[in-house]
Each structure stands twice: as structure tokens, then as C-alpha cells.
């Protein structure tokens, strides 16, 4: 979705806004990726958020870093006061799309607004499942193995330790006696650096990227008319990104904090649709059917009929067969001749 913003910004001629979002996106997306790695490290390589929960108390530095990244990617901010990085760059793109005055620009504006809602929902879903709620760690096979190994050998699990004295008491709260630890400083320092960019990069650089033609020094086409139109869009356009962000946040909070039974109930009502999206539109299955299986079939045909049936048969295997057959005949004649010679000498 973030790359989509950059493309349709360039499509309406807002090249500065596209580059600005590329710039801010580098901070918060890298921050979220590295933050996810820190969480996976703490959870003994478990990557399924359904087996996380309540981690903010155990890995607080990672939590605050990922919170900064989430606030940036969802575009949290107060108009005219301060906002995180994505607040400035994403809003600039939506304003440019609306201000372009074209039908495609209007379509891009509404599609971008809907994408912002989805981004907000899945980003806050990630945060709520990972850092809030009750621990669901013991449901993870990775955590079960870590607990079993630590209990059996008495050593520390990767990124955590096992509390054997309270293991039985902990099973009821979903931890299984597993205690995640914060990542080492070598992983936390990059999170801190990227957090600064996720928080301040938009506020510091938005005028340079959007309003300052001298900043680009002719590197991109600068449309002053479009920039002027961006500043003149209605207030509701400027507030659209914030409103859809709040809607996405509210839906995620309702489903994953307020009433955690909502996702399961929803899946029961739309099971075919859920399976379609859960299986990634069955893209892997279609790709396997259309490309992989035919490629393997052709490969087997070339191997069986071409390589084995022709090349090997009339090549090395055929020559070998001829030599072996000739050798067997010669060997038989020599053996027969030696037998007659031996018999004659005996006589």
C-alpha cells in the first residue's frame, strides 16, 4: 500500500510528495521490520501473532519502538500542530491526488483513503495481538520446545528464561513458565535511531520536500500550480487520512481488545471469503497448477525420452553396452583357448 501511494503521487505529478513518502517510509517500515525481528527473537523464533500477547511488559523498549513505527505508518498527528512521519507524507499524497482535478486523481484519492483505513486496521491489529491482551505463548510449538529444553537441561532459552519453580502455576495464564527477555543492545540501537526518524522526519522535512523548489534544484519536475492547489483543498480532505486512521484503530480495538470473540464469529459468517483471503487468493495453488506442474512434466519428458531414451541410449550407455558385449565374447574365446592349451600340455 505504501508503494502504491508513491506511484499514484507520481501519477498525478506530485513527485516531491512521492519522494517524501519514500523517505519517511524508509524510517517507519524499517523500524517495524527490525522491531518484528526483536519480537521474534524474544519469542524463541515464533512468528505467529496469535501466540503472542501482553509482551509490552516484557520487552518494553521493543514495544515503544514499534509503537513509534505504528504511529508513523498509520499517519497519527494533529493538523497544524505535530504529526509522526507518515502523517505529513501520506496526507500530502492524498491532497495532491484530490487537487490534481482529474478523474484518475479523484479515484486515487478515495482508493488511498480506503488503503489508509486498512493500513490502520492491520497495524493496530499487530500491536494489540502482540503487546496487549493475555499471553498465548504456551500454544506455540516453539515456546513449548523452549520450555521443554530449558526444563530438561536447566539452561536458558534463546531470548528468554524458563521459570521451573512456577511452571505449573504459569500454565493457567498462558505463559507456560516462559519469560521473554529484551533483545541485546546491538538490536535495540538501530531501533532507537529509526524511531527518531519515524517521529521527527516528517515534521522536519515536509516543507523542504513539498514546498521548496530550490531543495530539488531541478532534480524533479516541480509543478507550482499543483502545490498551490494542494494547500487550497477543503478541510475535510486534510482530515480524511486522520478520520480513516481512527476508524481502522477503532475496529482493531473492538475486535482484538474489547471483544476478542468478534474475529471468530466473523469467520463463521464469511467462511468462504475468509478461506479465499487466508489462502492468499489461492495464488500459490494457481501458480503451481499453471507453471510448476507443467514445467516438471516437460522436464520429466525431456529426461525420460531425450536424456535417457536418446542421449544415454545411443551415447555413453550404448557405447558401454557394445564394449561390454564385445569384451564378454573375447573373454570367452580366450578362456576356451587357454583351456585347450592347458589340456594339451598335460597330455
Segments (PLM) and residue ranges:
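Alpha-helical transmembrane segments of polytopic integral membrane proteins
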Residues: 33-36, 45, 81, 90-91, ...
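Hydrophobic, small-residue-rich alpha-helical packing segments that form membrane-like cores
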Residues: 1-99
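Alpha-helical transmembrane segments and their helix-start/interface "positive-inside/aromatic belt" motifs
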Residues: 57-67, 127, 181-196
